[in-house]
Amino acid sequence: MNDRVKVAIIGPGNIGTDLMIKIMRNGRHLKMGAMVGVDPNSEGLARAARMDVATTAEGIDGLLRLDVFKEIDIVFDATSAGAHGRHNELLQAHGVQVIDLTPAAIGPYVIPSINLEEENATNMNMVTCGGQATIPIVAAVSRIAKVHYAEIVASISSRSAGPGTRANIDEFTETTRAAIEKLGGAERGKAIIVLNPAEPPLIMRDTVFVLSENAEPAAIEASIAEMVSSVQEYVPGYRLKQSVQFDAVPPDMPLNVPGIGPRHGLKTSVFLEVEGAAHYLPSYAGNLDIMTSAALACGDMMARRRMAAGIARGFKETAR
């Protein structure tokens, strides 16, 4: 009996190509069915074709016309927030589940270390690379104390940022901010992304500042360490860059949080780095690795559930 379902990727850029290679190397319940783009000269489409994956340069409409489409159960959308709405509408009409790697956020936010097992929507949003790296830390603090405010700064190599990432900077900050509050548990959130032009390229680095109610620093540090271990299960290159730092914010010197006013308590500062697995781009592109690794974990879970429920579209066609 076959234990894999076929998937397609829309968007043969940096993220889409890295995800394709991950699926082919590490996917437990996934099998590449198609790679979809809009540029016939795309390097990603050419690479997919060399790896015997069906391709089309006619976008979502081309995917629907491919013979293999009737066997596709899951589609990963690695295009743009603007294009995702139409893609999702057409795919949902065919009973295909969608994993959204854009900041469109039509479906619920999913971060594997926080809520992977709880979600089973037909469209799941992978937040952003910065969100995948930093929101688990905010959630770790939230497990111990109420978080008034969380601010994250994601610094990625300019070389690792393709046209899709650059076109979605505004959506990146808004989606990440919303997920800091929704999944991280912060009363207010803020997200900043920095495209670092340094040469040689630096690996992804993230800074997380959290202002919470007073709590025992040791308990927060232990919660963060546990969360880091959870993320490392699917992103081995994820790690703390240095020890967690704590600063008291006394009642007579509160910090003013926009939208909610002055707050005091405990400030927690966490410094992270994410080294990529170098499946496609070099190891400095940890921002790609954490996003595609999270999407792979989500896809494997979707596939298991579809097969267990007997609703996999391509199951009969691909069964051995």
Curated annotation (Swiss-Prot):
NCBIfam families noted in UniProt: ac_ald_DH_ac, PRK08300.1
HAMAP family (UniProt xref): Ac_ald_DH_ac
Reactions catalysed, as given in the entry: acetaldehyde + NAD(+) + CoA = acetyl-CoA + NADH + H(+)
InterPro entries referenced in this protein's UniProt entry, alphabetically: Acetaldehyde_dehydrogenase, Acetylaldehyde_DH_C, NAD(P)-bd_dom_sf, Semialdehyde_DH_NAD-bd
Pfam families: AcetDehyd-dimer (PF09290), Semialdhyde_dh (PF01118)
Domain of life: Bacteria
Active site per the UniProt annotation: C129 (acyl-thioester intermediate)
The protein's Enzyme Commission number: 1.2.1.10
Entry similarity comment: Belongs to the acetaldehyde dehydrogenase family.
Binding residues annotated for NAD(+), in chain numbering: S160, A161, G162, P163, G164, T165, R166, A167, N168, N287
Protein name: Acetaldehyde dehydrogenase 2
CDD domains in the record: ALDH_C
One term of GO molecular function: NAD binding
Keywords, in A-Z order: Aromatic hydrocarbons catabolism, NAD, Oxidoreductase
GO biological process terms held by the UniProt record: catabolic process
